[in-house]
Amino acid sequence: MSPVANAFDIKSASLDLLALLLRTDNLDELSQALDARFGDTSDAPAEAFVLDVEALPNPTELDLGRLLPLLSRRGIRAVALRHPDNALAAVASRYGLAFANSAAQPRSAQAAAEPAPKAAVESAAAPASAPTMIIDRPVRAGQQIYAKGGDLVVLAMVSAGAEVIADGNIHVYAPLRGRALAGARGNHAARIFARSMEAELVSIAGVYRTIEQALPDSILGKPTQIYLENERLVMTALGE
């Protein structure tokens, strides 16, 4: 067999990607919301996202030509478009995106599980968790650390302009001056712990607060924990 015949193989692959669910096609409004949450992270490594447009009333009117560069400047690299209508596959292809039909994804399994909610809860009660990621060096401006599927522990300072993300909890045993996003895949029980709270932005399961809202003196520069309560961020000094 010639060497050319062994040049590559085709195998099945499963990628676990974050999805950006758009709730508006107003790009000015979306740009403001993205700035509030991410700022300009064009120097940071881009994170691959699936662009979910199922919630838009007229997804074909979405200006992807403007949207994709807008997302890229925030460190969001759209790799696929998701919607139940196959007609959008041509739109996705026009902009170099893959197309994922959300109607073809296994939702029937969820419906079948509804008559037996106890079994569903029990099976979901003990998900396989990834090992805790430990970072023992400073996270500098423009850097992004992501602990996929687990907790993140940072033993040094998170500088302004840096971003730490975890699907679980985030522990920063030094000043937290950048952005911290815990529960990135929707874990409402996730928490953020910081030795010195000075963050530009904190977020848990998509609920966020930016530096534009001044931190109260009770936690500014002090050991702090952050958690969700009734869909609102609660920030309290540790030990209180």
UniProtKB/Swiss-Prot annotation:
Biological processes annotated in GO: cell morphogenesis; division septum assembly; regulation of cell division; regulation of cell septum assembly
Top-level taxonomic group: Bacteria
Pfam families to which the protein is assigned, alphabetical: MinC_C, MinC_N
SUPFAM superfamilies named in the record: Cell-division inhibitor MinC, C-terminal domain (SSF63848)
Keyword Cell division: yes
Keywords of this entry: Cell cycle, Cell division, Septation
Known function: Cell division inhibitor that blocks the formation of polar Z ring septums. Rapidly oscillates between the poles of the cell to destabilize FtsZ filaments that have formed before they mature into polar Z rings. Prevents FtsZ polymerization.
Assembly mode: Interacts with MinD and FtsZ.
PANTHER family: SEPTUM SITE-DETERMINING PROTEIN MINC
Annotated family: Belongs to the MinC family.
UniProt-listed NCBIfam families: minC (TIGR01222)
Protein name: Probable septum site-determining protein MinC
The organism of origin for this protein: Chromobacterium violaceum (strain ATCC 12472 / DSM 30191 / JCM 1249 / CCUG 213 / NBRC 12614 / NCIMB 9131 / NCTC 9757 / MK)
Source organism phylogeny: Bacteria, Pseudomonadati, Pseudomonadota, Betaproteobacteria, Neisseriales
Gene: minC
